[in-house]
Amino acid sequence: MVKCTYGYDFNIDVEDLSLKADHVFEYLRPYNCIYLDSGRSCIKILCQLFAGRELLVPAFSCFSVIYGFTEGVKPVFYNVHEDLTIDFEDLEKKITAATAGIYVTNYFGHMISEEDAERLAGLKAQYGLIVVEDNTQSVFSGDLKIGDYAVASIRKWFPVPDGGVIYSKNSLATLDIRGLRRESKQIRKLYPQIMKSMLLREVIDFPAAQIAEMFAEVERELDAYSDNGEIFLMNEFTEFIYRCNSVGDMIKKRQENEKYLRACLNSPYLRPVLPKLNEGECPFNLPMYCTCRDQMRDYLVETCSIYPSVLWRTHRYDPVNGIGNIAEMGRQIMSFPIDQRYDKEDMDFLAEAINEFRL
């Protein structure tokens, strides 16, 4: 019987579903918001702002960003340094008369610096550009730094089946969402999410691999309908589950776990991707460069039921793997789970397993 798994998909425990005051809708109340089924859908809607023009996009991005633009938007990829800061020399030389905007990613809970935000503001004013912040990994790290609009796949933060948001201090009235329905197939993720809770509580004896395959099947469905251009509003039951999750408690637990695990790691194969988070920033997970990433990950999965995330395999993405050091970043970066499911004892277990690994 599986006692616990670390990382991978969230489980939903129905006994925890009680309404909270500080849910995500309250957190984002200062903004105008459109809630959709996924971050991919949000990107497709935002493409209306850049139809037929070029959008500068960071080369270190996920598959859904690199290949996700529609409406005739042409992504032009700019380099990102190993510390995930913008390569402004590369960015500026790629601005042309066809450029409509800049897409900026705040990685792993770390917001861009004030200096970089000011530099982007200068480019925005000089060329009349629209700036979009991708805050999928940093939505709970504070206010927008420079973006006219922001996008976030908030489903990655909580035990929910779906959810993405476009948010802005500007009006969103120009974005056309007429005819969108609340019929996302992502609601089917509830089945494996609840079964995983039952498995972890030892209520059922069911092959963990089959539950993992159920999660994978839902993601394949998302891939299929997203590729077909289908977009859905957030499911109503998903809204209820979001209202049962405290943002404040989530932020506090992630901050504690990230700080503790970072201090405990001493593997000779690892080095931090980012410096320590600034005051008030909320970590998505703990990213590390690993000189033997795939070997360590295989060991952790097979021996300890630890599932580190690989964000992202950019060495496999043809549009970006020839830019700067993006390919090598895709081969080495691995992210360890520090989310609100876990406590200090769990971080001790992770640290011991990671530190004990040897080639």
Predicted regions: what is each one?
Residues 157, 171-175, 343:
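Short helix-loop capping/hinge motifs at secondary-structure junctions, enriched
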Residues 133-167:
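Conserved active-site segment immediately N-terminal to the catalytic lysine
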Residues 10-29, 44-126, 138:
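PLP-dependent aminotransferase-like
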Residues 105, 132-133:
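Hydrophobic residues in beta-strands of the RecA-like P-loop NTPase core, especially within AAA+ ATPase
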Residues 7-11, 23-24, 30-34, 61, ...:
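PLP-dependent aminotransferase class I/II
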Residues 67, 84-90, 159-165, 318-321:
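Short, charged, surface-exposed secondary-structure boundary motifs
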Residues 75-76, 131, 308:
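Hydrophobic beta-strand scaffold residues
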Residues 101, 130, 149:
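Short, Asp-centered acidic motifs that coordinate Mg2+ and/or phosphate
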